[in-house]
Swiss-Prot record:
Origin: domain of life: Bacteria
Membrane topology listed for this record: Single-pass membrane protein
Function: Required for the export of heme to the periplasm for the biogenesis of c-type cytochromes.
Any single Gene Ontology cellular-component annotation: plasma membrane
Subcellular localization(s) per the UniProt record: Cell inner membrane
Protein name: Heme exporter protein D
Upper taxonomic lineage: Bacteria, Pseudomonadati, Pseudomonadota, Alphaproteobacteria, Rhodobacterales
Organism field: Paracoccus denitrificans (strain Pd 1222)
Length: 47
């Protein structure tokens, strides 16, 4: 394995935190899109 050096833990934690935040943003976007689509369909159905 590659030697990551003295700050390996910090760097890996930063990458992990970034990945978690990115996944959270993607999930929130997908859920908001689904909610908006449902609301639009309901609005169009009512006229």
């Amino acid at each position: 394995m590659t030697e990551l050096g003295k700050y390996a833990g910090t760097v890996l934690a930063a990458y992990g935190a970034s990945l978690v935040l990115l996944i959270g943003i993607v999930v929130q976007t997908v859920l908001a899109n689904a909610r908006a689509r449902r609301e639009l369909q309901e609005h169009e159905r009512r006229g």
